[in-house]
């Protein structure tokens, strides 16, 4: 209730999740999603629809924005952007996609290091230091550090 009452001033979006699809069925998941909207949720996340048709039904029958969890190799179908738009899905997440890619690449790097004693063979697959620092706005953080550092 506190989050709901104070969300306007900080731009918070409340996403309500239901796992009812897996346990008690799609009808109950949709019913709960609509109840969550009535209680103040902004977006509804029905976990584990089992087909594209179910995703379409969820987006049609829930009376507000729907989030879809797009996971490669998950229980739900992996859908294209066009399918999601056509279904009426308003927000899509890709949980663990980056982590899975990065972990695979890190494993390759460590295997290369173990086998050859060097990571140099993979230098062409790495960001330059300049590119890396730009991603993290390094200069901004150095300026903050310099402002507060005791010398």
Which residues fall in each region the model found?
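Flexible C-terminal active-site loop/helix
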Residues: 113-151
């Amino acid at each position: 209730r506190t989050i709901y009452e104070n969300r306007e001033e900080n731009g918070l979006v409340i996403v309500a999740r239901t796992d009812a699809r897996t346990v008690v069925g799609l009808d109950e998941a949709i019913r709960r999603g609509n109840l969550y909207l009535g209680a103040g949720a902004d977006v509804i996340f029905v976990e584990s629809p089992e087909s594209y048709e179910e995703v379409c039904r969820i987006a049609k029958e829930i009376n507000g924005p729907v989030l879809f969890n797009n996971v490669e190799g998950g229980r739900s179908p992996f859908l294209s952007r066009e399918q999601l738009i056509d279904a009426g899905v308003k927000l899509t997440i890709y949980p663990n996609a980056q982590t899975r890619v990065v972990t695979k690449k890190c494993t390759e790097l460590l295997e290369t290091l173990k086998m050859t004693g060097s990571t140099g063979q993979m230098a062409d697959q790495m960001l330059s230091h300049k590119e890396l620092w730009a991603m993290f706005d390094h200069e901004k953080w150095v300026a903050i550090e310099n402002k507060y550092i005791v010398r």
